[in-house]
């Protein structure tokens, strides 16, 4: 399975907020410049009040939860997984299978800030994660131009059928807290769209179940 977390709410604080008192105070506390810290709804709620599309931004915890679920899975450890993150600001983050994502959230935040600043982590030696400018469309084309999507409006299938469908596919999951894909072609151009259960699931919950289904289909569990 190649996981693509799309339109993820992961970005550095935009320049329009650099002078906001909440941003300045948080950056000073951490010994960084305002433009070097991640936008985080939990700490920057007041500053984000007038930010464009604020409801879809500032949730690095979603990316953290998804990568923890995926990178430490049996699927990934068996060499059958690869993860990519497409951010709201059109960055593409590639994550090597051997990458052990920090389990501590604060450490993860620091890692992402370094990644945006340097373009790779670690800064020297073999890169485990790399960030580059790029669109979601370009990434999916690089990955073969075919994908399936997980979405609450998709077709309900059995656990076994889901596993067979996603085990060797490019799987697109939304990485935002509210709303729907802004790129409507994600669902329109997908080979198939599946839903898991009868309620809307958080991204990490959807990924956990898709990964488990793939592991079962591949005989890993």
Swiss-Prot record:
It comes from Pyrobaculum calidifontis (strain DSM 21063 / JCM 11548 / VA1). S-adenosyl-L-methionine binds at residues 174, 179, 196-201. The record marks 61 as: Stabilizes Arg-59. Gene3D superfamilies: 3.40.1280.10. Keywords: Methyltransferase, Ribosome biogenesis, RNA-binding, rRNA processing, rRNA-binding, S-adenosyl-L-methionine, Transferase. PANTHER family: NEP1/MRA1, RIBOSOMAL RNA SMALL SUBUNIT METHYLTRANSFERASE NEP1. This is Ribosomal RNA small subunit methyltransferase Nep1. Pfam families: EMG1 (PF03587). Its EC number is 2.1.1.-. It is an enzyme of class 2 (transferase). The record marks 59, 100, 103, 107 as: Interaction with substrate rRNA. HAMAP family: NEP1 (MF_00554). Belongs to the class IV-like SAM-binding methyltransferase superfamily. RNA methyltransferase NEP1 family.
């Amino acid at each position: 399975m190649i996981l693509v977390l799309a339109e993820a709410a992961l970005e550095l604080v935009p320049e329009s907020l650099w002078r906001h008192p909440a941003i300045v105070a948080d950056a000073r506390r951490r010994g960084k410049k305002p433009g070097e810290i991640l936008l985080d709804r939990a700490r920057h709620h007041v500053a984000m009040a007038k930010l464009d599309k604020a409801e879809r931004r500032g949730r690095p915890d979603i990316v953290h939860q998804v990568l923890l679920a995926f990178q430490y899975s049996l699927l990934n450890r068996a060499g059958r997984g690869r993860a990519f993150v497409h951010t709201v600001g059109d960055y593409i983050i590639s994550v090597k299978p051997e990458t052990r994502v920090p389990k501590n959230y604060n450490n993860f935040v620091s890692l992402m800030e370094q990644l945006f600043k340097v373009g790779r982590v670690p800064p020297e030696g073999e890169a485990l994660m790399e960030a580059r400018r790029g669109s979601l469309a370009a990434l999916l084309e690089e990955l073969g131009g075919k994908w399936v999507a997980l979405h609450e409006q998709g077709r309900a299938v059995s656990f076994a059928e889901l596993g067979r469908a996603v085990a060797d596919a490019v799987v697109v999951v939304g990485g935002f807290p509210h709303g729907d894909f802004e790129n409507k072609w994600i669902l329109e151009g997908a080979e198939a769209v599946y839903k898991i259960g009868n309620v809307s699931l958080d991204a990490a919950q959807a990924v956990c179940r898709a990964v488990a289904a793939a592991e079962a289909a591949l005989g890993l569990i």
